[in-house]
């Protein structure tokens, strides 16, 4: 059944329709769309078989793309293979993951980095990949923490977190993008306005900031402050402007107050001008960061009026235009990225949220209310050609972000698109009142879009980015390079300093060295574990019974754990990652003694000599 187009909307007379579209948005229930014409079973079977063939990647073969999906309230990033939609791994960032030994033990570098940056939890929304010459380069991934005003950098050489930094003066670090073409900055939008200068509760003092961070160190270099909220971010391609959608120019403190005006804006920040103002000392230093107040220094931020409460902000691959999705308007506003003039405002459907691109001049916009992806031609829309709408496909259900492969670069691939849906409503086996998140893979290589797969994920991906295997796979490390602090085979030792004990330990199939050590009850124990394996994927773990300790140590890696020894007795430690036929035998003892009892600082105290047969009794 072909869906009718939404009624025409004159942006100048948007007021009369604001209630209709606003309430259509907030109460829209996900609908399953069924075809009116019954399909011939053979044709349907052939279509299903064709889709299955497209996404099938045989065991032992590799996917064409890495897909990085933000984890939302799970606090990390999920990695999938495309087109198979196979879950590959999670990159934990703002939340501990005991199974991966991430930030779950005192003493680990990941715990210290996370603790020093703020709360032990985060809300990740927008993954961003580094680029060189308009193409992904496979070096870095950046991600925001909306809840706690932080940004993290992941080193894609190891898929490890390299940096986490708190951004001063910001609440709701939401939209995130890399400043192009250099990536010398990543910039992040402060969505939640507040008084960051005087710390009052008076809304008259509320402001938000857009912060520019060094792309490597994540140190905040400067900020631009303004009244209102900044939502999604995107960069021009020539180093001049970066763009953000801005809503709540009313400075309202309730949902009703935030939608009173018929027009909000896209903000264009002149980055070279901002740098010049900072260099000339015209910014005010607030909480250690130069802040440019755009209300006092004109020109650094230009507001381009668009329909109220815009959401998505996307720059086209050629850098000519920036698109602002209407959300409460059934339109997408097309803005010249150089003149900052609106050139068109085509209607696309109900609840447009985000747009992405192929390599043939087409735009794909997610429609939250319609539960669709709509394909439309950019140049035709600009010229006013009524045939600009090309295709629509139903998704399941209530899509938020959508992202095509390579769409953030100057060279999109034009083959695959992911629809990140907000509700699944029976798409998967029931697992309780809450259902898994639903993502769908869409083939966009032809004239017509085709949904070829649906796959669940943990909660809750907001955005995604896809990079070719050819760009990244060969750059990923086989093993870690042993750091200088690493304990080498034959250098294991126990060092005691009063009530503090350090154990310098190695692990290799299938043995911990030492296999025992002695401590007093209440001692502060730090284990420095080094995996001396040289073979990829030979990970070892270290769990200590009844002490809540689990380390994960990849080949060539060192990890530390600090804890307090419990009551007297024997506590076994063992390897938590299956590594060999003698995996169960890969264990040792922590011998905890009462204060005053003698303890040994030698390796393997209390061990039974290998040539002595232990006593045993059998029934």
Regions found by a protein language model. Give the residues of each.
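Extracellular/periplasmic metallocenter environments
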Residues: 489-492, 553-619
């Amino acid at each position: 059944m072909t869906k009718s187009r939404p009624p025409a909307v004159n942006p100048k007379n948007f007021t009369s329709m604001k209630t209709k579209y606003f309430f259509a948005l907030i109460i829209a229930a996900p609908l399953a769309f069924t075809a009116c014409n019954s399909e011939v079973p053979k044709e349907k079977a052939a279509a299903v078989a064709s889709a299955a063939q497209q996404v099938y990647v045989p065991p032992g073969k590799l996917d064409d793309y890495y897909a990085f999906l933000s984890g939302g309230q799970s606090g990390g990033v999920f990695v999938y293979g495309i087109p198979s939609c196979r879950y590959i791994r999670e990159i934990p960032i703002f939340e501990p993951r005991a199974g991966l030994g991430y930030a779950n033990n005192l003493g680990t570098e990941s715990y210290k980095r996370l603790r020093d940056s703020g709360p032990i939890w985060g809300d990740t929304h927008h993954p961003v990949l580094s680029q060189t010459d308009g193409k992904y380069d496979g070096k870095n991934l950046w991600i925001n923490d909306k809840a706690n005003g932080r940004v993290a950098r992941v080193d894609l050489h190891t898929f490890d977190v390299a940096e986490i930094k708190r951004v001063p003066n910001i609440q709701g670090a939401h939209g995130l993008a890399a400043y192009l073409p250099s990536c010398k900055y990543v910039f992040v939008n402060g969505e939640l306005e507040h008084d960051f200068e005087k710390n009052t509760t008076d809304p008259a003092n509320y402001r938000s900031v857009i912060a520019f961070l060094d792309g490597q160190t994540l140190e905040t270099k400067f900020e631009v402050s303004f009244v209102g909220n900044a939502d999604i971010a995107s960069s021009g391609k020539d180093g001049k402007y970066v763009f953000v959608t801005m809503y709540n120019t009313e400075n309202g403190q309730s949902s009703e107050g935030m939608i009173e005006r018929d027009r909000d804006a896209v903000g264009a920040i002149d980055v070279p001008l901002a740098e010049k103002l900072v260099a000339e000392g015209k910014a005010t230093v607030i909480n250690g960061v130069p802040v440019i107040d755009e209300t006092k220094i004109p020109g650094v931020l230009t507001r381009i009026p668009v329909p109220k409460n815009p959401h998505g902000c996307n720059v086209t691959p050629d850098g000519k235009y920036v698109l602002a999705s209407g959300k409460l308007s059934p339109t997408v506003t097309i803005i010249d990225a150089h003149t900052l003039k609106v050139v068109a405002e085509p209607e696309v459907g109900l609840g447009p949220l985000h747009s992405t691109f192929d390599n043939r001049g087409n735009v794909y916009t997610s429609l939250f209310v319609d539960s669709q992806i709509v394909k439309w031609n950019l140049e035709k829309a600009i010229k006013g050609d009524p045939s600009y709408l090309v295709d629509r496909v139903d998704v399941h259900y209530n899509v938020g972000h959508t992202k095509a492969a390579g769409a953030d670069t100057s060279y999109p691939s034009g083959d695959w698109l992911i629809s990140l849906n907000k509700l699944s409503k029976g798409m998967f086996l029931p697992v309780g009142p809450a259902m898994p998140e639903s993502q769908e893979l869409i083939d966009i290589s032809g004239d017509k879009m085709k949904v070829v797969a649906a796959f669940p994920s943990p909660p809750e991906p907001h955005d995604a980015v896809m990079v070719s295997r050819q760009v990244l796979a060969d750059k990923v490390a086989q093993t870690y390079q042993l750091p200088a602090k690493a304990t080498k085979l034959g250098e294991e030792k126990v060092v005691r300093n009063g009530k503090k004990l350090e154990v310098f330990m190695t692990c290799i199939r299938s043995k911990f060295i030492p296999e025992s050590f002695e401590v007093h009850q209440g001692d502060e124990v730090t284990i420095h574990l080094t995996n001396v394996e040289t073979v990829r994927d030979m990970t070892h773990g270290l769990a200590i019974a009844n002490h809540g300790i689990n380390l994960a140590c990849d080949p060539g890696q060192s990890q530390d754990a600090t804890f307090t020894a419990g009551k007297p007795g024997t506590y076994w430690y063992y390897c938590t990652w299956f590594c060999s036929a003698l995996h169960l035998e890969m264990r040792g003892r922590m011998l905890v003694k009462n204060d005053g009892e003698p303890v040994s600082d030698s390796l393997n105290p209390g061990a039974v000599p290998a040539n002595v047969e232990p006593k045993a009794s059998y029934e």
